[in-house]
């Protein structure tokens, strides 16, 4: 396994609360960086979305920790289960991005952040009630145009759209009536998305076709060797026929929709014996394609993927290559985000009430 920690400086910054999730916000200017955290205060059992600014070089000194300032917050009705940046649908682009917070009580809230006026939270929309989700909303993904898809432990799949002046409108795509549960979702096209949950199974849905999923990777391919839950899914914007998934026992695998019956296992259960040092053997909480790591492989191979795990590893996995370890923390890494505008920059939320920020060379 290749180690890269010595090639860049990692800044670990304590927080006053547990950080469930973290996402970069669009860069509104050359000087200011902003990010959102889903924070949980165990002392008073309250959860919030906090908007924070980051100055990577306070007072022009490159040798000091970045300066982080909390600018605004919004109190959630229950613990935040999914934090996402809601694209530009209905928002003001880089200056007024939207952030969505899904909750453990089954609601979805959309906040508009004014980065010009001190990151004030100007307004919010909500979708809630028993007709929306019953119980925890596990996964949310947005696409351009202000439309998202939500999945939950209740087995429901909803498509939600921001309607200016009216709030959120949603329609139910599927209701598993509690017999199935979904943990992750990702758009593949304006009409198609992929879901994942228990059993290392993935499902492709097409909004043009009602009812069941139009294709699926059955969850029994791992032959019951371990508990199997998909926690995160990502789809590369230029290769929408291939999605990547991360889950239990350090497992990261790809599903090529052109050959839907067999996964391409990159790490964990069923991985190639040529990989001597698996990146992780615990729960993989998040996966994202990493556009910053250059690959010279052919178009038939899987592009590099960044992952974080319960055993504190943040690293990069590429098909047929030894994994690269970026961070090895003494606690779980709950989530991470690669800055879309500056993909060398990565931010992580750590189990021990802190965040880690670094910029790759």
From Swiss-Prot:
WD repeats: 132-173, 177-215, 225-265
Superkingdom, taxonomy of origin: Eukaryota
InterPro entries: WD40/YVTN_repeat-like_dom_sf
Any one GO CC term of the record: nuclear envelope
Family matches, as SUPFAM superfamilies: Putative isomerase YbhE (SSF101908)
PANTHER family listed in its UniProt record: NUCLEOPORIN NUP43 (PTHR22652:SF0)
Subunit structure: Part of the nuclear pore complex (NPC). The NPC has an eight-fold symmetrical structure comprising a central transport channel and two rings, the cytoplasmic and nuclear rings, to which eight filaments are attached. The cytoplasmic filaments have loose ends, while the nuclear filaments are joined in a distal ring, forming a nuclear basket. NPCs are highly dynamic in configuration and composition, and can be devided in 3 subcomplexes, the NUP62 subcomplex, the NUP107-160 subcomplex and the NUP93 subcomplex, containing approximately 30 different nucleoporin proteins.
Protein name, as recorded: Nuclear pore complex protein NUP43
Organism: Arabidopsis thaliana
């Amino acid at each position: 396994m290749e180690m890269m920690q010595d090639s860049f400086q990692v800044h670990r910054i304590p927080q006053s609360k547990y950080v469930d999730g973290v996402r970069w916000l669009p860069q509104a200017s050359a000087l200011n960086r902003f990010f959102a955290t889903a924070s949980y205060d165990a002392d008073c059992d309250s959860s919030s979305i906090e908007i924070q600014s980051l100055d990577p070089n306070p007072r022009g000194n490159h040798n000091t920790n970045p300066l982080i300032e909390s600018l605004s917050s919004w109190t959630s009705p229950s613990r935040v289960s999914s934090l996402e940046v809601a694209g530009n649908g209905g928002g003001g682009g880089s200056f007024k991005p939207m952030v969505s917070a899904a909750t453990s009580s089954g609601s979805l809230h959309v906040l508009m952040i004014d980065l010009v006026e001190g990151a004030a939270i100007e307004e919010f929309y909500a979708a809630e009630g028993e007709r929306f989700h019953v119980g925890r909303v596990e996964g949310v993904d947005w696409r351009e145009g202000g439309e998202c898809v939500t999945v939950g432990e209740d087995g429901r799949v909803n498509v939600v759209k921001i309607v200016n002046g009216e709030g959120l409108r949603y329609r139910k795509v599927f209701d598993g009536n509690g017999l199935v549960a979904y943990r992750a979702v990702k758009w593949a096209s304006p009409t198609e998305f992929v879901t994942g949950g228990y059993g290392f199974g993935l499902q492709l849905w097409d909004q043009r076709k009602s009812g069941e999923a139009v294709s699926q990777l059955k969850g029994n391919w791992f032959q019951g060797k371990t508990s199997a839950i998909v926690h995160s899914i990502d789809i590369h914007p230029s290769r929408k026929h291939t999605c990547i998934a991360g889950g239990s026992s350090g497992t990261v695998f790809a599903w090529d929709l052109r050959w839907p019956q067999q996964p391409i296992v990159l790490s964990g259960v069923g991985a190639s014996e040529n990989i001597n040092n698996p990146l992780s053997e615990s729960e993989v909480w998040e996966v994202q394609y990493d556009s910053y790591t250059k690959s010279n492989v052919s178009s038939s191979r899987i592009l590099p993927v960044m992952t974080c795990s319960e055993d504190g590893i943040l690293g990069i996995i590429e098909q047929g290559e030894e994994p690269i370890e970026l961070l090895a923390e003494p606690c779980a890494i709950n989530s991470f985000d690669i800055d879309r505008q500056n993909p060398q920059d990565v931010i992580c939320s750590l189990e021990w009430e802190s965040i880690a920020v670094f910029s790759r060379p």
